[in-house]
Swiss-Prot record:
Domain Sm: 10-70
Keyword RNA-binding carried by entry: yes
Lineage, top ranks: Bacteria, Bacillati, Bacillota, Clostridia, Eubacteriales
Spans traversing the lipid bilayer: none
Full protein name: RNA-binding protein Hfq
Keyword Isomerase: no
CDD domains xref list: Hfq
One GO term (biological process): regulation of DNA-templated transcription
Highest rank taxon of the organism: Bacteria
One GO location term (cellular component): cytosol
Subunit composition and interactions: Homohexamer.
Keywords carried by this UniProt record: RNA-binding, Stress response
Pfam family, one: Hfq
């Protein structure tokens, strides 16, 4: 029996990346970063702000707030 685990973090980040939804990333020190998610892995998020890329470590992130609602897809068809 195969157990499917839902990784909400990856689903959320992948959707904002694919749909080009602008986000505000709030860091644990209170700083805000705004831009588009270009990629991510287990430890980092790449954010594009006005053509400049920033590699942000996930342990420094407090909150990610999208500029519009994100359609969360929980099935295998949503993976790319």
């Amino acid at each position: 029996m195969v157990k499917n685990t839902i990784n909400l973090q990856d689903i959320f980040l992948n959707q904002v990346r694919k749909e080009h939804i602008a986000v505000t990333i709030y860091l644990t020190n209170g700083f805000q970063l705004k831009g588009l998610v270009k990629g991510f892995d287990n430890f980092t998020v790449v954010l594009d702000t006005d053509g400049k890329q920033q590699l942000v470590y996930k342990h420094a992130i407090s909150t990610i707030s999208p500029m519009k609602s994100v359609n969360l897809i929980f099935n295998e068809q949503g993976k790319e």
